């Protein structure tokens, strides 16, 4: 599918969200799994504000995560958003981009809103950890928490802090860089699978084709990583998401795990004592081990978790943030 007024296409790989590290350790990597979408028109901000789980009005010089839900409160897409002049920029996985944009367009009606694929001519780079030192070595500014900075033709986005997981990521502050495709940084960038390992290590959910409509935001800790605000007014699924929040507890939460063997696909089941208790959100494989983000019944974390009823045990790791009551 083509974005409006553009010649670029998006990948529709249904198995996206499972990654295998093939390159050497790298702190600056090329991330080709994202599509960049520019949204313009006098009604663009108002329209998007009424569609997503986070506030789009008042973005200013910040970058925010947001989700797009079904009327039943299930996540269809996740994204990062920031302003570029009067345009709203959306960073979404290529694999969900076509269905996501198609669905958004259904609700534009008479509003002045246009979607344009802005991926041509740019490359997304990820700083997978220790961003202060990495960016300083590159003579680039470090964005403040949640901020966007621009430097010599680059757009640098702050990203959530990740924890250290030996062999996968060094942890610490992270960043995303929108760079011209011919920029010198691009040639030296490493394996993009390390970016997705850092996303798992940050406890940061991305919705992939196999996990569309599986999770309410709280089941993947989305409100704990800045993806939901509860005072912005209506959006699709808002009543369900708010109801879960005001109950005070949710029976499902996201966790990080390490397990021997090949990386599972997103949406693959998680088992406890032979019973299905959750689903894989994302997975990265390296050297015979897989780092996974998964959502499961909270009570199941007290027992043995596996990827198959008789499979290897998942070693549950700490999250880089606290699980709090939803109330």
Residue spans for each PLM region:
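Acidic, low-complexity central loop/insert segments
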Residues: 25-30, 35-36, 80-202
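Glycine-centered loop/turn motifs
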Residues: 61-64, 141-157, 263-268, 304
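Short, intrinsically disordered, mixed-charge
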Residues: 49-57, 98, 102-110, 140-141, ...
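Short, surface-exposed ligand-recognition loops at beta-strand->loop->(often short) alpha-helix junctions
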Residues: 38-44, 127-130, 258-265
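Glycine-rich, small/acidic residue-mixed loop/short-helix segments
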Residues: 220-227, 242-327
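Acidic, proline/glycine-enriched N-terminal capping motif
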Residues: 2-78, 83
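Structural motif
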Residues: 238-239
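Short, conserved active-site entrance elements at the starts or edges of catalytic domains
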Residues: 191-192, 197-223
């Amino acid at each position: 599918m083509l974005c409006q007024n553009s010649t670029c296409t998006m990948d529709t790989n249904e198995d996206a969200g499972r990654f295998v590290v093939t390159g050497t350790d790298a702190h600056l990597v090329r991330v080709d799994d994202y599509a960049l979408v520019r949204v313009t028109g006098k009604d663009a901000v108002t329209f998007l504000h009424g569609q997503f789980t986070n506030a789009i009005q008042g973005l200013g010089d910040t970058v925010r995560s947001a989700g797009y839900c079904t009327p039943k409160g299930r996540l269809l897409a996740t994204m990062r958003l920031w302003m570029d002049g009067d345009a709203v920029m959306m960073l979404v996985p290529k694999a969900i981009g076509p269905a996501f944009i198609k669905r958004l367009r259904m609700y534009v009606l008479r509003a002045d809103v246009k979607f344009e694929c802005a991926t041509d001519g740019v490359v997304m780079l990820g700083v997978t950890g220790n961003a202060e030192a990495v960016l300083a070595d590159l003579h680039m500014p470090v964005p403040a928490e949640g901020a966007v900075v621009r430097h010599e033709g680059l757009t640098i986005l702050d990203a959530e802090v990740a924890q250290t997981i030996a062999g996968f990521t060094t942890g610490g502050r992270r960043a995303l860089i929108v760079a011209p495709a011919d920029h010198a940084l691009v040639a030296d960038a490493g394996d993009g699978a390390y970016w997705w390992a850092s996303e798992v290590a940050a406890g940061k959910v991305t919705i992939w084709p196999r996990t569309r409509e599986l999770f309410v935001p709280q089941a993947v800790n989305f409100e704990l990583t800045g993806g939901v605000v509860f005072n912005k007014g209506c959006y699709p699924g808002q009543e369900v998401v708010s109801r879960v929040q005001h109950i005070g507890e949710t029976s499902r939460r996201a966790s990080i795990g390490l397990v021997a063997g090949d990386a599972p696909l997103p949406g693959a089941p998680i088992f406890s004592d032979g019973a299905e208790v959750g689903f894989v959100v994302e997975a990265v494989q390296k050297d015979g081990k897989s780092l996974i983000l998964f959502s499961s019944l909270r009570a199941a974390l007290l027992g043995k978790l596996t990827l198959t009823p008789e499979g290897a045990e998942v070693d549950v790791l700490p999250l880089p943030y606290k699980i709090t009551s939803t109330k």
